[in-house]
């Protein structure tokens, strides 16, 4: 009892004289914009790795960037979430064929009569103004970081041929070289059809053998039938004798996502809570995982050709004068490459991402890896021990390689010795055989020469 009273007395004195700092550890706010799957604005991922500074005992020798286009309008198409589908739904909201009950107190859709849509079907697929700024700024930052490698007179910039990707690559070039961009660059447009073969930067379009497989549609339908009914039930009372469909919910998510991309604000996002956004984010993860990622056999095949080309460039560092490599592409090409490089080993075709419930801890989160303007940068260093080491940056964060040992610090610094990296079981099939596998298993078109990525 004496000790208890002594402790309480001591505590009272401490509390009376203490200058308390506000405890903020539990004050984190949910930022829904970072959970809009691949339609999220650019942001860093959550796997906070080591510092991205160059190691003090190493010298940068090569850098390879695989860069997604900037923020854009919806893709063309009539389906829900596509440009025409969203535009038609917007018109139905405005003309009353999707009848909002404005008599309901606190109706979150009460703004619709004075709302002016910014999503237009005529702008389908086009890069947004913010997308141009994003890529310009990224090009500027890339040049500032790696300027010592820019020792050539011109640089080949490979880009998937779709206009928004080409525009992104051009704005990136302006960020690096300013008005002299055309004096320093050679833009090489890579076809987005099957003729590109293993050089494709939209490899899902260059693999005829995969065309008959559709694992994505049943996966998405299954998940939508889990998470959308509660949303429909919650929102239905705000409409007059109208029951929302899954397509309606998808279009509401689409308006929210693309208004954020086009103007960084959307009243429609207020219809959803944090759980809704996490469930929508998971839908995006299922789409990538079952479409071209780690839940299907095609994921590592689609990404293997780039992985093999990258590995060839890394291996030839001592005989190669080229030090900077550029490839501009889509989100749907970056995820397969990262799959082939062994980033997402927790799910496989034998253990796919579940469609009846959400796995919060899965590794492949599209919001983190491929937001608008997302990128995968591969750095090659030579260190004081004369060995070469590989490191990946995902959207300005070091990806925590854990399958191939350590860097020269002998700690978890995100670096691996070059041949330990290339020969690791999680990626050796891609780094050694990716092009051959793509050619054979995809029944791909032959190419005259392999592009150096």
UniProtKB/Swiss-Prot annotation:
Enzyme Commission number, as recorded: 3.1.3.2
Stretch forming the signal peptide: 1-18
GO terms, biological process: cellular response to phosphate starvation; organophosphate catabolic process
Coiled coil: none
Residues glycosylated per entry: 95, 151, 183, 193, 243, 319, 410, 429, 443
Enzyme class: hydrolase
Entry-linked SUPFAM superfamilies: Phosphoglycerate mutase-like (SSF53254)
GO cellular component, one term: cell wall-bounded periplasmic space
Active site positions: 69, 331
Keywords: Cell wall, Glycoprotein, Hydrolase, Secreted, Signal
GO molecular function: acid phosphatase activity
Record PANTHER family: ACID PHOSPHATASE PHO11-RELATED (PTHR20963:SF18), MULTIPLE INOSITOL POLYPHOSPHATE PHOSPHATASE-RELATED (PTHR20963)
Family: Belongs to the histidine acid phosphatase family.
Protein name: Acid phosphatase
């Amino acid at each position: 009892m004496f000790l208890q009273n002594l402790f309480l007395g001591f505590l009272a004195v401490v509390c009376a004289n203490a200058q308390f700092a506000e405890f903020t550890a539990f004050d984190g706010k949910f930022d829904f914009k970072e959970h809009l799957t691949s339609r999220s604005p650019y942001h860093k991922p959550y796997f906070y790795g080591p510092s991205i500074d160059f190691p003090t005992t190493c010298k940068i020798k090569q850098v390879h960037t695989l860069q997604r286009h900037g923020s854009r309008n919806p893709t063309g198409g009539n389906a829900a979430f596509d440009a025409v589908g969203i535009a038609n739904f917007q018109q139905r909201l405005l003309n009353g064929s999707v009848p909002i009950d404005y008599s309901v107190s606190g109706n979150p859709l009460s703004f619709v009569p004075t709302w002016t849509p910014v999503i237009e079907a005529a702008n389908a697929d086009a890069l947004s103004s913010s997308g141009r700024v994003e890529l310009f700024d990224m090009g500027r930052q890339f040049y500032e970081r790696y300027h010592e490698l820019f020792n050539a007179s011109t640089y080949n910039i490979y880009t998937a041929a779709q206009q928004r990707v080409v525009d992104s690559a051009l704005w990136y070039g302006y960020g690096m070289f300013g008005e002299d961009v055309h004096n320093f660059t050679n833009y090489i447009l890579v076809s987005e059809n099957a003729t590109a073969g293993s050089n494709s930067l939209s490899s899902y379009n260059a693999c005829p053998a995969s065309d008959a497989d559709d694992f994505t549609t049943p996966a998405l339908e299954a998940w939508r039938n889990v998470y959308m009914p509660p949303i429909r039930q919650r929102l239905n009372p705000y409409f007059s004798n109208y029951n929302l469909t899954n397509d309606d919910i998808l279009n509401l998510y689409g308006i929210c996502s693309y208004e954020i991309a086009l103007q960084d604000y959307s009243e429609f996002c207020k219809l959803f809570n944090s759980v809704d956004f996490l469930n929508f984010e998971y839908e995006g993860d299922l789409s990538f995982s079952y479409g071209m990622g780690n839940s299907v056999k095609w994921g590592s095949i689609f990404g293997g050709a780039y992985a093999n080309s990258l590995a060839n460039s890394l291996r030839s560092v001592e005989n190669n004068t080229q030090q900077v490599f550029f490839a501009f592409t889509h989100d749907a090409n970056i995820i397969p490459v990262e799959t082939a490089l062994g980033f997402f080993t927790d799910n496989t075709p034998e253990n796919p991402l579940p469609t009846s419930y959400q796995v919060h801890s899965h590794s492949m989160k599209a919001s983190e890896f491929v937001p608008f303007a997302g990128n995968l940068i591969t750095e090659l260093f030579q260190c004081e021990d004369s060995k070469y080491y590989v490191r990946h940056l995902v959207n300005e964060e070091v990806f925590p390689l854990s399958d191939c040992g350590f860097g020269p610090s002998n700690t978890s610094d995100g670096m691996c010795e070059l041949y330990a990296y290339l020969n690791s079981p999680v990626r050796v099939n891609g780094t050694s055989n990716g092009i051959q596998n793509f050619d054979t298993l995809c029944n791909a078109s032959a190419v005259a020469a392999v592009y150096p990525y």
